[in-house]
Structures are given as structure tokens and as C-alpha cells.
Amino acid sequence: MNEQNQLNEIKRATPVRIEGPKRQTSRKKAKTPRLLPGFGLTLGVTLTILSIIVILPIGTILGFALQIPPAAFWQAISKPVVWHAFATSLTTAFVAAAINLVFGTLLAWILVRYTFPGRRIIDSLIELPFALPTAVAGITLSKLYSETGLLGSALVKLGVSIVYTKIGIIIALVFVGIPFVVRSVEPVLAKLDGSYEEAGAVLGANNFTIFRRIILPEILPAGLAGFALAFARGLGEYGSVIYISGNSAKAQTQVVSYVIMQKLNYVDYEGATAMELVLLVLAFLILLTVNLMQLRQARRLGGR
């Protein structure tokens, strides 16, 4: 009985904690400060600038082209000199872009995977064609590869002529286009995990198999992007090509940009606009095709 009384006294002496209804506290996520304004304003500003810089000039070309009668349009683009100019631009731009794809990828590989004296200098020199005026590049290349030039004089002794030939056009397009491939492939190679290559080597794969099965699928979309940019740039290139091609209709070294300029000089605006539209459509189809190939490659890699 005494024990029961002591127990009751302890219970009465113990303070009772009265818990009220639990409050549901919602933690609001702290908003990170935005460097740019909201989506609506940003999108509006971006579309406005894009319209002024890109869409409006392209729309102007389309508007002028639609005003040309179909018969006059076909007559402007069906001339032999125009066909030869398009054939020259397409073939030389494609060959130059293919060369840039191969050697640009090799150059990016060397700059990323190896450390050697002068690597930073070479990496900076790659962007020189972006900063150098194309006319200056064309004059320099024409002097260098002329019959009295440093390289041209040696090549002439071997029976090889560079200036005023399609080979000279390709060299000029390689010069202006190689930065596109290098700068497209270089970041992908830098982020590529080397453990996959080590795993392939441990499993007994040779270097060619490792490159074909592991490295190539990863860098292929970036390489195609650089190829497309170099190809599209080569189609409309003027300054670096005009001094080394010779612009001979007989030798078929006239490019599309030169023929367009000639038509503008002779006040043939319909002919120039028609050629500009065809060139614009070709460049768009090339870029669209490469983008679709990149998307397909990315989906294939994502489904592995």
C-alpha cells in the first residue's frame, strides 16, 4: 500500500507535457538568385535579337526571291556558268570539310591527350583563321603557293600547280574551316572518361578496336557538327578563295560567291537573288541532315 502511494505521488509530481496538434511545417526551398530575368522576358529578348539578326535578312531574301517569275528564276540558275559554280563550290567544300574532319580530330586528340612544349601556342593558333580577315588569308595563301612562292616553287618542280586550281580552293577552305572541327571535338575528348579505354584494354581489345567501339561513337556527333559547320562555311566562302582560285570559267574555278558578286556588279539582282536562295536552301539541308544524324547517334548511344 505504501508503495502504491509513493507511485501515485511520483506521478503527480512529474510534469505532464501537453502536446498540441502537430503543425505541418512546409519548408520552402530557398530560391537561388537568378543572373538572368524570367523565362518570358529572356525568351522575348532572344527572339527579338534573333529576328533582327537572322530571321529578317533571310526573310528578305525569300521575299525578293518570291517576286521573281518562275521562268526568270529558272533561267537565272540554269546557265552553265551557274551550274559549274555550284558544282565547284559543293565538291571543294565537301572535300575540304572531310579533310578538316580527319585532321581536325587528330589535332584535337593531340592537344587533349598529350602534353608537350608549345601546346598552348598551337591551341591558340587554331583560332587565328577566325580573327584573320579572309581576304588577307587569300592573299597570303596565293603568295605562298604561287610559282614564285615558298611552297609553290617547290611544288612546281614536282609538276604540281596549286594557284588557280581547285586544289588551291580546297587549301583555302581547309584553312578557314579547320577551327570548327577542332573546337567541336576538343571539349568532348576532354570530358571522355578514360576508364572505358582501360577496361577495353584489360579485356584484350587492340587500339583500333578501342577507338572504333569506344571513342568514335562518343566523338562522332561533335565531329559531324564541325563537319557541317565547315561545309556550310565553305559553300559561301569568298574572301580567302577569290585570290587563289583564278575565277576562270574555262577552268571551272569560279565559286558561287564569286558569280553572285559578278551578278551584283552587273546589276543582275534577280540572278543574284536566285543563286542566294539556292545556296541558302543547300546550306539549310546540309545542316538539317547532319543534325538529324547527330540526333540518331545520340539516341543510339542512349539506348545502349
Where are these regions (language model features)?
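C-terminal transmembrane helix and the adjacent membrane-cytosol boundary/short C-terminal tail
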Residues: 12-18, 41-45, 56, 60, ...
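Short hydrophobic faces within alpha-helices
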Residues: 86, 111, 128, 195-203, ...
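Membrane-interfacial helix termini and adjacent extracytoplasmic/periplasmic loops
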Residues: 29-34, 70-78, 83, 118-119, ...
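Transmembrane alpha-helices
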Residues: 44-49, 128, 175-193, 207-240, ...
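Periplasmic/extracellular loop-to-transmembrane helix junction in inner-membrane transport proteins
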Residues: 30-40, 61-98, 113-114, 262-270
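Interhelical loop and adjacent transmembrane-helix boundary motif
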Residues: 36, 73, 80, 238-289
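Transmembrane-helix boundary motif in ABC transporter permease subunits
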Residues: 33-34, 95-126, 139, 143, ...
